[in-house]
């Protein structure tokens, strides 16, 4: 459902897009030439001559990682998304021994999004 997915990435996660409908949406990123695209699964499978199968549950084969400047930004984003009523498959933010602080949220189709930072300060 492109409407639901675009609303999630635009309105909840704050990614910019000029999408006005249709089967394809491009989002701007702060990192310059890197692009983030959504493409209707129902249209995408046609390129492979496959049958469309709606997703169920958490997609365990794909993750999108969004990195923030500091641990404090990670905690603030977690609190903001919590206030919006989102759920977190792995729970609250955690800091690992190897220096990453992160948490996970799932988009409306079950794709995991890791939100984290490697910068304590």
Question: Which residues fall in each region the model found?
Answer:
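Residue-level marker for the onset of beta-strands and adjacent loop->beta junctions
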Residues: 13-14, 23-25, 62, 89, ...
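A short, acidic/glycine-rich surface segment
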Residues: 44-51, 91
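Core segments of cupin and vicinal oxygen chelate
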Residues: 1-45
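N-terminal beta-strand motif that seeds the catalytic metal site of vicinal oxygen chelate
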Residues: 1-6, 63-66, 118-121
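Vicinal oxygen chelate
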Residues: 27-30, 49-121
